[in-house]
């Protein structure tokens, strides 16, 4: 039944994704983060105090998320096994973000194909932290490809990884880790101290999933009739060409599969950030690379699900 729950949740995400106005645990986690952050900032003022308070915030948010998920699931199972199973499917469904990621990328791709640069910049600004107001088509394409490649890890592979390790409650706890990093894990002055623990722990949580993404995206590239060998080679060569210890693993693999170059200089919060280049520019990046990257994302997602199901079956057999 557990494996069936995984599969149904994955299929639901593939077909419908997260309905825009439905209640979603990430929104609840976000409200909890805002509430706890407000308390921390009220009592902590020095950088040292903010770092300690940020660590306490991380423990409270992640612990509360895991505890609530475990409690709701246990209560539902006690009421009726089928209710418990349905709640498990719903929880898994909410931690997967494949369809939402694909939709967000396509929302940028669509106006770009229609030469509506202003609209594509607006839609891109919803999913990236960089300044999009002056970006040209090539830069927009690059930003979308990077976003899909990076979020293949924390939107799909990592949730499935923690689902395999500890069931739906641990997958929900990972989502809290990821949401904390998204909200406070920045390096600029406002969040540098309070978000330090959140940023570091997100790096720790994604360490293995990011490296697994290199292998899965490389295999997916071959299955998608792209260059799987080049994806693995470039992915390995450029795996550290990023300020994050994890992001370049998936981005470099996608760059290698497509034969394009990612990274380079961008503006974040009014500051120019010069990132290393990732990949080899064997050709110019194009709008078609967005749809190719989405296919790679779905390929890696399918392979991850199959891998964890096989591992679960093998461990069950051994036990």
From Swiss-Prot:
The organism's place on the tree of life at top rank: Bacteria
UniProt pathway: Cofactor biosynthesis; adenosylcobalamin biosynthesis
Entry GO MF terms: ABC-type vitamin B12 transporter activity; threonine-phosphate decarboxylase activity
Membrane topology: Multi-pass membrane protein
Main localisation: membrane
Alphabetical UniProt keywords: Cell membrane, Cobalamin biosynthesis, Membrane, Transmembrane, Transmembrane helix
Family designation: Belongs to the CobD/CbiB family.
Protein's recorded name: Cobalamin biosynthesis protein CbiB
Native source species: Salmonella arizonae (strain ATCC BAA-731 / CDC346-86 / RSK2980)
Gene: cbiB
